[in-house]
From Swiss-Prot:
Name of the protein described by the UniProt record: ATP synthase subunit alpha, mitochondrial
Gene Ontology molecular-function annotations: ATP binding
Biological processes annotated in GO: ATP biosynthetic process; proton transmembrane transport
Source organism: Spinacia oleracea (Spinach)
Domain of life: Eukaryota
Gene: ATPA
Free-text function comment from the UniProt entry: Mitochondrial membrane ATP synthase (F(1)F(0) ATP synthase or Complex V) produces ATP from ADP in the presence of a proton gradient across the membrane which is generated by electron transport complexes of the respiratory chain. F-type ATPases consist of two structural domains, F(1) - containing the extramembraneous catalytic core, and F(0) - containing the membrane proton channel, linked together by a central stalk and a peripheral stalk. During catalysis, ATP synthesis in the catalytic domain of F(1) is coupled via a rotary mechanism of the central stalk subunits to proton translocation.
Amino acid sequence: MEFSPRAAELTTLLESRISNFYTNI
């Protein structure tokens, strides 16, 4: 299974959204 740069980018974006969500609580 290849891990595409796009998938890595989406994962990073998702993680940053999640961390922002938790810091805003």
